[in-house]
Amino acid sequence: MPVTSRPTTRVAAVDCGTNSIRLLVADVGPDGTLVEVDRRLQIVRLGQGVDRTGRLAPEALERTFAASREYARVIAETGATRVRFVATSATRDARNRAEFADGVRAAIGVEPEVASGDEEASLSFRGAVAGVAARHAGPYLVVDLGGGSTELVLGTTSPDVVLSLDVGSVRMTERHLHSDPPTPGEEDAARADVRAALDRAGEVVPFGRTVTLVGLAGSVTSATAHALGLSSYQRERVHGAVLGVEEVLAACDDLLHRSRARRLALGFMHPGRADVIGAGVLVWSEVVARVRADVAAEGRELTQVVTSESDILDGIALSLA
């Protein structure tokens, strides 16, 4: 009797974060293969002011609903049969998230899920490891550096330790980096905040076990594009890029100390990221330095960092197979 293979499923995944909302339409096979059909990003800054007010701002909600309506059109045109909408840090923290849910439901026709920090981290790990496991050994420390939070996941084939930290590019900008470019005092305060968070994280996540450090999301990919000297953003060059630790730290330092105008002059820089990238790369540089130090304390050396364009969005898509 001939063996028939199960067909692929066309799925649509939406990741609604603190700074951006992204869509991935893909064909997912029963073996976990993923073939991209359409991928989009819009900067909506949903988390605008949430760290201070505890609420999603009306103008931020409207930007997000408008993007959701556009994504609903793409989903219908591409014929996706399964849709999952996952919201993360900003929505978790907001007192008016029911208003957000009502607007998304009206715009896109599905119930938005507000992921816990642990679930967000697990989805990020699944997407990231699928993109790098063939070329790099575990254990992997996957770092998903978002606008409102940073997810840390340590594991090999599945997450062993998961932790979500309330440090991200938008949150740290609003808390500390008010000048353009940041003043030394603002930078020192931000670094102290991030280091305190990493000290707490180190009590839960054994950073020293890391064999491959994998960075995800816009702050990391922008720093990688800068380190590679790209004049325009090239996803195929950024995904899977392996950089020396010192290259990463130098690129982060340069981006942090540039003015917004000088960041915008970089051909790869998304206009909606230029004002928060300084805080994002500050967080990333502190994570890289901390992991390198803890690996060294275990008698090993961390010399390289991997960047993945496969992240929570891919993890959401894979969960729909």
Question: Language-model segments: which ranges?
Answer:
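A generic, well-ordered mixed alpha/beta core segment in the N-terminal half of proteins
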Residues: 141-149, 153
